[in-house]
Curated annotation (Swiss-Prot):
Keywords: ATP-binding, Glutamine amidotransferase, Ligase, Magnesium, Metal-binding, Nucleotide-binding, Pyrimidine biosynthesis. It comes from Frankia casuarinae (strain DSM 45818 / CECT 9043 / HFP020203 / CcI3). The gene is pyrG. Disulfide bonds: none annotated. This is CTP synthase. Belongs to the CTP synthase family. Catalyzes the ATP-dependent amination of UTP to CTP with either L-glutamine or ammonia as the source of nitrogen. Regulates intracellular CTP levels through interactions with the four ribonucleotide triphosphates. ATP binds at residues 19-24, 76. Residues 584-594 have a biased composition (Low complexity). It catalyses: UTP + L-glutamine + ATP + H2O = CTP + L-glutamate + ADP + phosphate + 2 H(+); L-glutamine + H2O = L-glutamate + NH4(+); UTP + NH4(+) + ATP = CTP + ADP + phosphate + 2 H(+). Homotetramer.
Amino acid sequence: MGQAHITKHIFVTGGVASSLGKGLTASSLGRLLKARGLRVTMQKLDPYLNVDPGTMNPFQHGEVFVTDDGAETDLDIGHYERFLDVSLDGSANVTTGQVYSAVIARERRGGYLGQTVQVVPHITDEIKDRIRRLADDSVDVVITEVGGTVGDIESLPYLEAIRQVRHEVGRDNALTVHVSLVPYLAPSGELKTKPTQHSVAALRSIGLQPDAVVCRSDRPLPDSLKKKIAMMCDVDDEAVVGAPDASSIYDIPRVLHREGLDAYVVRRLGLSFRDVDWTEWDTLLRRVHHPANTATIAIVGKYVDLPDAYLSVTEALRAGAFATDTRVDLRWVTSDECSSPDATATLLDGIDGVIVPGGFGVRGIEGKLTALRHARENGIPTLGICLGLQCMVIEAARSLAGLEAANSTEFVPETPHPVISTMADQHEVVAGTRDMGGTMRLGLYSCVLAPGTLAQREYGAAEVAERHRHRYEVNNDYRHRLAAAGLVFSGTSPDGRLVEVVELPADVHPYYVGTQAHPEFRSRPTRAHPLFRGLVAAAVAHADRRRGMLPVDLPSEDAPTPENGVPENGAAQTRGVTAGRSGGSIRRGASASRPSVSSNGTAALVSP
């Protein structure tokens, strides 16, 4: 009889400070183990009391990452999916709100048979059950990241649950990796290990002895400091891993492998493995560091002061850049600042592409509409995502279809032309008579693409599936009028009732596409999403024309309207114009107050 399969557990904790990059460390380790032939899944334990991040302010939490099954999760789940090239489900993100809700609901049903319900054992048992639920025969390793920092009150039940899991599965089947900060003090010119020593001491006081320590720093750690940390924290010398800032987040697996973390883990857990297969990742790194092309793309959004609010968008854009061998310089543009056509022209000067991402609420909407009009009229490749599609429809209704008061019922409930309206099953939510959290149109839905359209060409398929997160949709009462004005409805739900993709014809604009979905959630660094790849390719072509001052065919300002002679397919007369001059690569809007972010992530997510 064969030996029973035993799933191994790796727990990743953090100390000294938040935002050290536990998620990227865990993701990179997962990538290394998968490259060694192991089957890996990942999970994030979040100590906040929200059931999920769906109703959180983007400025507080960053983006909400949506899984195939419609779960609204932490942005680290996006890192897990991108680095491992897998699709996770809602079980990958556990929150204190979920845990307490489940325990209290069970108590109300009489599930505890009159017991006094307590943090230990009932809350910790629920946490353990959610950890162990992932450990089935299809998985060799479960990597579980604990959110927050050791010493936080709200993290204590999770750390106690991990201690118990280690005891129950056996020391040979569980391993704890502690990510800690080793700061550099400029006045003394020294890296200091004392914060890490105290952090490990705090972890040990809870009953958890780390097996490995990943030391985050802004420079490499000398071997003498590694030995000191090993001695003072009671871990093996080879288990102290230096993790200095990297030039790209995609360098982190190489850094951790060079430090020997993955080799130590597989040996410590007794895992069968092969050597790391770097074929795919090395190809990626070559494109990260040695691209052949360049282009500048603006993200016109409401939450640009916190780039994490658009994390998957920027990573999908970088993946599109890698796929086209391009370095993309990002320019962050606050939609509020696009207050007039002249201001917008200044902010978007020298731009080769525009992304209008998702969001909620009326603030900044008029600025997005102005930016979209500028991009449409000047032939700048543009991708609208979720709210971006809705803004494209509103702008087309106003500028092309002559519906000057067109709007969304989200912004102006009594608008005379609601070209964007509340979905039928969302009216009670909008009215406040039904819960807001977890009630949007969430998860994976199919989309049928019209033959011969740009969207169908980019996808290379007649039907695709994308993840969604929205309450509003294109109003079908206006579809015929908008189509007559030149807007192409190139993708719909299989029943044809819900608009999924809009675009302008290729003879009117080189790349002007909007999707109601969130395609960024299905992009991978080694497998770019078609819409982002297409946007970058179009932006590179635009950049080449702009730098060469070559003629660009654009719709004529006095082209006929649908009422006076434009063919039904929306084709318009074009005129030759000269593209604007090149702008600098370090821009935030019109100023240099924020560095641009290259497609390799150099100026943003540079630490594991």
